[in-house]
Structures are given as structure tokens and as C-alpha cells.
Amino acid sequence: MSDKPSPSDKQAETPFQHDCSLQADFRGLKCPLPVLKARRSLGQISSGQEAEFLADDPASPLDMAHFCETEGHTLLVSDERGGIFIFVVKKK
């Protein structure tokens, strides 16, 4: 009997919900770190590509919306599931 998680177990552990060019997990980080790391992460993809970010800081929905508005990116998804905030951002 194997102690390794099956692929379906691993998928259950991964809360990413979207098929994006980049996925980054900022859970455990407090403001302003999720937005600062999102900015840096977006530098890794091209204009028009999408990135999915996870965060659990209660301030992150407001922070991510403000970040996208001021930087010109499009916030496609801002959702919360089980205390995890899920964001999909389209890079300008």
C-alpha cells in the first residue's frame, strides 16, 4: 500500500480553479505582500495572458481590485471559497 497521494488527492489539495498561463499562491501573506508579489509575477507573462492568484488575507479583494485598476490590468475573477480568495488577472 502506497502513502503517496493519488492524482485526484493532489488535485483536491490544489485550490487553483482556472487554466491560466501563471498560477501563484500567496496564502499566509499579509497586505501588501500579495499585491507586491502579484506585480512581480505578472512580469513573467506577456500582455493579454492571464494569471491566477490565491490569497487568504481579508484585505486582498480590495487590494487586488485597486492594484488592477491603477496598473491597467483586468480583474476577471474575484471569488472566495472556504476562506481562500481566488483572483484571475489579465495582464495589460
Please report, for each region that a protein language model flagged, where it lies by residue.
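Core SAM-dependent methyltransferase catalytic element
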Residues: 86-92
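N-terminal first-folded block
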Residues: 3-43
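A broadly tuned "polar low-complexity/structure-edge" signature
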Residues: 2-3, 21, 55, 63
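Intrinsic-disorder/low-complexity, polar/charged segments enriched in Ser/Thr/Lys/Arg/Asp/Glu/Gln
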Residues: 21, 48-52, 84-86
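Amphipathic, hydrophobic secondary-structure cores in small proteins
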Residues: 26-79
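Intrinsically disordered, low-complexity segments enriched in Ser/Pro/Gly/Ala and basic residues
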Residues: 1, 5-7, 59, 77
